[in-house]
Amino acid sequence: MEIGSSKEVVVATWEFGAACVDAAVHTLKQGGTALDAVESGAAVAEADPGNRSVGFGGTPNRDGVVQVDAAIMWGPGRQAGSVAALEGILHPISVARRVMEVSPHVMLAGEGAARFALEQGFEEVDLLTEETRKQWEVWRETRAGEGENHD
């Protein structure tokens, strides 16, 4: 999609990505940067409890914990930031951006990523919904001993 006089392109590959694209395009039309657009678009997916692949309401790991990952890159500055296995933070994309902008690191993971996020003022939240918690409990009771397909 062409935005204004520039040639920014916003693309999504999954059905839930349409709302993400809309948010990113809106950000660009409001004068935001490409980084702002990436962050706002990803944040839509992260906050959508209907999207079980990421973020709030996402499928928990075998321990019943939703862990999230995100990465962001800025080509002109050859910068990148990412987080992995982050727990309890709604918008990992924003934490990844903060890693890129204020940290000497390119990636933070697990407890270190969570500690950094909290130090940067991000709020801790429970990423499980009641529905995903119940689904995990059923899985734990019926399939926990079987082979795993995702964690």
Protein language model annotation of sequence segments:
Residues 1-151:
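Alpha/propeptide regions of enzymes that mature by internal proteolysis
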